[in-house]
């Protein structure tokens, strides 16, 4: 009878040892890396979220090339203007007048400014799609003389829009 009692105990110990070994091995492996979400799908409806201006310029440049136009590059001065305009709109909780912004930019010596001001898009993909579908916004992205841009968003948590957008394109 002693042998019958020892066998089930031995089997139980083997199973416990196997389970412990598997658990130890599992603890040593690293989980697979999480896939990084492309910048154009990243939500900008969060505090501290910033648009990837270089990625946006690449997307707009590809669109322009498909229409026989030259690419655009991020310009630090236009980037600052876009950031300031996006913050102004978020603070006022309403989009600004594109004509007023264009006049201000032209008065500051910026050559042939074209401006998209909008609100409510949470990702670059949404904004780009919306701008392509809007004749006025599409004309801005396809401004023939544009060679540089600034693009920015500002988050307004209490606003129905949440995210305000400023895209400024200009000539050389």
Ranges and model annotations:
Residues 1-28:
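Sec-dependent bacterial lipoprotein signal peptides
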Residues 66-80, 93-104, 138-154:
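Surface-exposed patches in mature extracellular/periplasmic domains of secreted proteins
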Residues 42-53, 65-74, 87-91, 113-119, ...:
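Second-shell loop/turn segments in exported
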Residues 79-127, 141:
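Short, surface-exposed glycine/acidic/tryptophan-bearing loops
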């Amino acid at each position: 009878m002693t042998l019958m009692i020892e066998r089930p105990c031995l089997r139980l110990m083997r199973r416990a040892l196997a389970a412990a070994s598997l658990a130890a091995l599992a603890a040593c492996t690293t989980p697979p890396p999480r896939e990084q979400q492309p910048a154009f799908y990243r939500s900008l409806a969060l505090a501290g979220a910033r648009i990837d201006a270089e990625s946006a310029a690449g997307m707009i440049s590809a669109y322009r090339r498909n229409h026989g136009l030259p690419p655009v590059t991020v310009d630090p001065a236009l980037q600052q203007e876009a950031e300031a305009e996006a913050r102004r709109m978020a603070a006022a909780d309403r989009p600004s007048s594109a004509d007023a912004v264009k006049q201000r930019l032209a008065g500051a010596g910026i050559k042939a400014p074209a401006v998209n001001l909008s609100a409510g898009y949470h990702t670059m993909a949404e904004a780009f799609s919306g701008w392509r579908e809007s004749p006025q916004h599409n004309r801005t992205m396809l401004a023939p003389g544009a060679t540089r841009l600034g693009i920015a968003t500002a988050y307004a948590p209490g606003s129905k829009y949440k995210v305000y957008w400023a895209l400024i394109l200009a000539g050389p």
